Amino acid sequence: MSLFSSITVEEFNRERTVQLADDHFELQRPGRNHEWIVRNVLPIGYERYCAVSLPWEAASDGESHLFFGFREAYHFFKRPVPDPLTLSRWHGDFKFVEANREIPPALKGILSRSAESADLVLVRCCRSSDPMDCYYWTTERALFFELTDPFWEMPHRFGHFDIFPRGAAWYMAHRDDEPLLYLAGTARLLDSIHTALPDQALPLRLDDRFF
């Protein structure tokens, strides 16, 4: 039995009380060679944005090495850490694959507390650019944050995901081929994330690249 219950697109959109940019992919379909940026995917109107790394692997001399943070890999390979370190720079400096999608416990705690008045978390999974290939679910907020890897428990595990609690206190986006969670929220929330995960969170602006 699935831990996620199906809902309609109308029910999902009714709860998604957010503002989308004019060039958000739902309002303006990007061309094939479009370089995606944060506002193409995440809602605008939140105070701050960031990317949080999930476990990822980089190869060197035929061996694969597991990392959790961004700077950690520079130190391991004895490379200077860029200043400033940006998501685009990290993405260009390493060839990597996603190791797993276990959400850091500290992040789960912060997100759960910031939405403690919400009873549900809502999820959209789009497996392709076809709107008919999008699926919508809800699950209990407390249950969602008990799961080590909530994506593994979803009816469809792969695709592009939009996730938010009822009331949209924060907003999360994730692609299954990138070891990243993109987050939008209040300044206080993002400050808490950067404090708890100093090497796993990088600040973003709306016009930064979305990978």
Identify the residue ranges that each predicted region occupies.
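Acidic, proline/glycine-rich low-complexity IDRs
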Residues: 1-211
